[in-house]
């Protein structure tokens, strides 16, 4: 396959700015950021692959440019077919639900490493000269302080700071990539388009169908990264990302697994997904489906739309401090956030709950018969034992370790959850 055809088939996210031709050097144009990639060591072995190594590094592009437009992936659902053949359960709308190993996968998250297909999550490409300023004004994070190769979490909120969704952002050379929840992608795109004015140089594009997204999580994630010669990302800040070539296809790897600051996220074309997936499994990653991922989301404490994120709760009650800038100036929801901070207006907070029995989301939380909150998510524990939930509880009513009642007679002990425990209120002079 020649270079031009390969680029067309990859059909990834951005138009390549230019391609440089260097004698006797294998180059791959990166559709993410307009650079050319020289191969970097990526060992592929086991699982039927020939042992081979790829060398990659970024090379500056020349002024001569070739433009590539988006096109459909060459083989629709090739990755999902591979999952189905290997025993994975795939829903009608293309979500990898389970590998009949949920408890094993949850154990691997705690003690080993898992890989989960998050391709059903939304991916939004925001391009144009005004993209950073635009997102700076539309979300809670300080985009104007970020540079190419960095990343962050940011929150989409209403004008009154009520929560819509958490977005994970990668700052690339020619665009900003937003990863959002599956249920909010279209509504966020529609909302953003409403705020683009005539003179704004901003373009919004849904690239979910043109890309695949994997998360690698667990304490042994770094070992796999080292085996694949991607160790230069180990220890880098959350959101830091780099572009590579994998089996002749472009892939972007970022620090953080969406559910945790640890682990990694991998973005690639549909054509490269099978090779990446099989290689990660060959290196020891345990596959995880969306059912186990949802259990993990709840036990880790990451808020989700239509559960913890809704017009019922504001962003400070959700405890998403790492995603909020308090001093970047005017942005949507800023006035409400400022008032809440100034007048100590945060009356409730999101907490974990160790429950004595199963409970339905939406159940009332009480203390001494008085309503103090609401259960928003519930999941059973590993191996059919234990019950856990997330819920909003009034600050003055209960603290970590206190007992509350959920529903009629279910006992719940208020607990700390990892995702929220990592959040830290920014100081007044913070530039974040």
Curated annotation (Swiss-Prot):
Expressed in young leaves (at protein level). It is found in: Plastid, Chloroplast. InterPro entries: GCST_C, GCV_T_N, GcvT/YgfZ/DmdA, GcvT/YgfZ_C, TrmE/GcvT_dom1, YgfZ/GcvT_CS. One of its GO terms (molecular function) is transferase activity. Pfam families: GCV_T (PF01571), GCV_T_C (PF08669). The keyword DNA-binding does not apply. The keyword Transferase applies. GO terms for cellular component: chloroplast. Its EC number is 2.1.-.-. It is an enzyme of class 2 (transferase). Keywords: Chloroplast, Plastid, Transferase, Transit peptide. Folate-dependent protein involved in Fe/S cluster biogenesis. Functionally complements an E.coli mutant defective in ygfZ. Belongs to the GcvT family. PANTHER family: AMINOMETHYLTRANSFERASE, GLYCINE CLEAVAGE T-PROTEIN FAMILY. This is Putative transferase At1g60990, chloroplastic. It comes from Arabidopsis thaliana.
């Amino acid at each position: 396959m020649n270079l031009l055809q390969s680029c067309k088939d990859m059909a990834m996210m951005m138009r390549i700015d230019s391609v440089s031709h260097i004698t006797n050097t294998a180059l791959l144009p990166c559709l993410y950021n307009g650079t050319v990639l020289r191969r970097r060591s990526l060992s592929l072995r086991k699982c039927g692959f020939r042992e081979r190594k790829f060398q990659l590094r970024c090379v500056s592009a020349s002024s001569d440019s070739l433009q590539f437009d988006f096109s459909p992936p060459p083989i629709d659902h090739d990755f999902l077919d591979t999952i189905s053949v290997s025993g994975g359960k795939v829903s009608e709308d293309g979500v990898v639900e389970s590998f009949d190993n949920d408890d094993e996968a949850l154990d691997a998250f705690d003690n080993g490493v898992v890989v989960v297909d998050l391709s059903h999550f939304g991916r939004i490409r925001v391009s144009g000269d005004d993209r950073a300023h635009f997102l700076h004004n539309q979300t809670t994070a300080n985009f104007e302080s970020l540079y190419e190769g960095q990343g962050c979490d940011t929150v989409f909120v209403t004008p009154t700071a009520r929560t819509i969704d958490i977005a994970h952002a990668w700052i690339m050379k020619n665009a900003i990539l937003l990863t959002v929840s599956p249920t909010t992608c279209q509504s966020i795109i529609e909302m953003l388009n409403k705020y683009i004015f005539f003179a704004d140089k901003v373009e919004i594009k849904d690239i979910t169908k043109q890309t695949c997204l994997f998360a690698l999580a667990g304490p042994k994630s770094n070992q796999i990264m080292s085996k694949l010669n991607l160790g230069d990302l180990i220890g880098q800040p959350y959101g830091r990302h780099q572009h590579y070539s994998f089996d002749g296809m472009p892939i972007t790897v970022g620090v953080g697994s969406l559910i945790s600051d640890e682990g990694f996220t991998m973005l690639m074309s549909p054509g490269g997904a099978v090779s990446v997936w099989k290689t990660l499994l060959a290196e020891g990653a345990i596959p995880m489906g969306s059912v186990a991922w949802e259990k993990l989301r709840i036990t880790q404490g990451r808020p989700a739309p239509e559960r913890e994120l809704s017009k019922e709760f504001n962003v400070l009650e959700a405890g998403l401090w790492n995603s909020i800038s308090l001093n970047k100036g005017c942005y949507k929801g800023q006035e409400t956030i400022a008032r809440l901070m100034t007048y100590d207006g945060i009356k409730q907070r999101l907490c974990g709950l160790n429950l004595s029995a199963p409970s339905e989301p939406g159940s009332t939380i009480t203390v001494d018969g008085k309503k103090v909150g609401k259960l928003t998510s519930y999941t059973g524990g590993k191996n059919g034992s234990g019950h856990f939930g997330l819920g909003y509880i009034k600050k003055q009513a209960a603290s970590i370790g206190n007992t509350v009642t959920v529903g009629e007679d279910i006992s719940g002990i208020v607990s700390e959850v990892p995702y929220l425990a990592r959040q830290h209120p920014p100081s007044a002079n913070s530039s974040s």
